[in-house]
């Protein structure tokens, strides 16, 4: 796991995925400013998304192995993440699993429907591949889509960063709420604590660390 984290830090720092300045962001149904932002949208080339896919694949292999039927990438950011993870699982470990994703707008021509790719069936174990969880809103929008596929099980979700932020209920993170509400175990490549420790190693970020630490003390459960 340490190798996964180290590679993830170095790669994200190089690609400018860490943004360390005030960003207006929605959290737990409220808008607030955060001094840091992690954006997988800055992965813009084949090489970059391939590396990110390897980080997800390594985490999947380490935690659930082959014990799932298919992976689902929620629109929009989850689509390339699930695609990259599926390709990397096969290329790195010889594990070939189907994947699918949803459309934001249901298509009424061609193949039609709101899902693209694998068609889930009763008894399937689905894992979700997503960017981050902040308020858990995206998960709550995703679950009706998956449950609408039939009697499927969704036990695990994989994200790049656990921001460890409080959710709707005081004293609980959004990830804790997702686990209690849906029974989903969320696996993150890194946590905000990991990122904080990594950034402390570079003097470049000394000016932002106090604001980051204040934010974490106020909004995070560590």
Regions found by a protein language model. Give the residues of each.
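PRPP-associated nucleotide enzymes
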Residues: 1-129, 134-222
């Amino acid at each position: 796991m340490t190798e996964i984290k180290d590679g993830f830090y170095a790669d994200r720092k190089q690609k400018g995925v860490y943004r360390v300045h005030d960003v207006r962001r929605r959290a737990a149904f409220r808008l607030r400013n955060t001094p840091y932002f992690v954006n997988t949208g800055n992965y813009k080339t084949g090489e970059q998304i391939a590396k990110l896919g390897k980080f997800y694949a390594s985490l999947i292999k380490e935690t659930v192995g082959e014990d799932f039927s298919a992976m689902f990438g929620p629109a929009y950011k989850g689509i390339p993440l699930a695609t990259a993870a599926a390709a990397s699982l096969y290329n790195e470990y010889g594990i070939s699993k189907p994947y699918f994703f949803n459309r934001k707008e249901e298509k009424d021509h061609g193949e039609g429907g709101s899902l693209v790719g694998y068609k889930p069936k009763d008894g399937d174990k689905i894992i979700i591949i997503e960017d981050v969880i902040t308020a858990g809103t995206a998960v709550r929008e995703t679950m009706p889509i998956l449950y609408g596929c039939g009697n499927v099980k969704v036990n695990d979700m994989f994200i790049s960063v656990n921001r460890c932020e409080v959710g709707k209920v005081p004293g609980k993170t959004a990830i804790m709420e997702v686990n209690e509400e849906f029974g989903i175990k969320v696996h993150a490549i890194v946590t905000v604590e990991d990122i904080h420790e990594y950034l402390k190693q570079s003097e470049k970020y000394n000016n932002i660390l106090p604001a980051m630490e204040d934010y974490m003390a106020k909004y995070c459960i560590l």
